[in-house]
Regions:
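Residues that recognize and position ribonucleotide moieties
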Residues: 20, 42, 49
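Short, well-ordered loop/turn sites that connect or cap secondary structure elements
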Residues: 34, 43-44, 63
Length: 83
């Protein structure tokens, strides 16, 4: 018997930043994904956060315009006024 796994549809959301970059842990708090810095750290260290399609375990990773942060079936595209 074969079991078919349904793929969870991914959501896409643009997130506008007004600075040159935002740290990954600060981004998770900014979007309300993590309630505290400790929770953001846990999400990142547990490997459930991807940056541009690759697992990122560096909580101080600088996220720039054009980057995509993925967590919990949502892809957040970082944008600025310039793009």
């Amino acid at each position: 018997m074969k079991i078919k796994e349904k793929a969870t549809p991914r959501k896409n959301e643009n997130v506008k930043i007004t600075t040159e970059f935002i740290r990954l842990d600060a981004f998770l708090k900014f979007k309300g994904i993590a309630e505290t810095g400790g929770q953001a750290k846990t999400f990142i260290q547990d490997g459930i956060v991807k940056v541009n399609g690759e697992v990122c375990t560096a909580r101080g990773k600088k996220i720039h315009a054009g980057d995509t942060v993925s967590i919990f079936s949502v892809d957040y595209k970082i944008i600025t006024d310039e793009n």
